[in-house]
Amino acid sequence: MSDSEGGVEVSSPRLLIVTGMSGAGKTQAVQSLEDLGYFCVDNLPPALIPKFAELVSQSNGKVEKVALVVDIRGGAFFHQAIEVLHDLGEQGYRFEVLFLEASDETLVRRYKESRRRHPLDNHGEVLKVIQEERELLREIRGRATKVIDTSNVSNNQLKEQIITQYGGDKENSNRLLITVISFGYKYGIPMDSDLVLDVRFLPNPYYIPELRCLTGNDEPVQQHVMSQDVTKEFMEKLIDFVQFLVPHYQREGKATLMIAIGCTGGMHRSVTLTNKLGEVLSEKGYRVNVRHRDIMRV
């Protein structure tokens, strides 16, 4: 939908309706969509979808991709879904419907293994309510633009399918985002780190008077740290190590990797190496975000 209201351009975001069988993988699908930058809302009553779409369309492009989960947990409200989708189309909104399903046998097994109760099950008859749900969803399945059967699909394989179908820029969407962060050990290790590297073994510029009040963002400090043979050797090994790890992390479906590099105060050595590692990884085509946590503490 692209319209002009009061001289203001209103553009439609990419709107994805996620629905399907309970236990078929909607939660995993939504997590993958969130990694792709989608604004996700779970269990939204169908009657609210048009109003939500209108609000998002008036966000001036701040929200470009939206995924709304609509399923039988909505109870009586769910029966409005088909009518609402029809109205969305009539109003000019662009939307897609992703339907996730699995075989009865697979769904029964998943519920047995998870020990969770099916939303429609009040009497312990899992197979019966699965079949009832399949019938309730028959019409909306017919409106689906994409159906994924997850019977023999792992979580990582499902994520790959979601990325392929909805990632837009597939090359960028499927690449790990590497955050390299410097820190000072005196202030603690970043709690969300995946890899922690202690570079306090390197010569400390703090003890050189003319470098003490500078940081690893300043060229004199960078030249001093990077001129050391031990630093050069360490960086070579570190870059090889990271390049070895990244494909394995991606294969496991990891979306982000945080590498924390620490020195005593988080001002000189760690900042220099964080900048250098970020620069080299960017040149090699990785998606990189560089941060300095403690550089302003002094």
Swiss-Prot record:
State whether keyword ATP-binding applies. yes
At which positions is GTP bound? 71-74
Q: List the disulfide bonds.
A: none
User: Which parts of the chain span the membrane according to its record?
Assistant: none
Q: What this chain does, per the record?
A: Displays ATPase and GTPase activities.
Member of which family? Belongs to the RapZ-like family.
Question: What is this protein's record name?
Answer: Nucleotide-binding protein Dred_3054
Q: Which organism is it from?
A: Desulforamulus reducens (strain ATCC BAA-1160 / DSM 100696 / MI-1) (Desulfotomaculum reducens)
Q: What is the lineage of its organism?
A: Bacteria, Bacillati, Bacillota, Clostridia, Eubacteriales
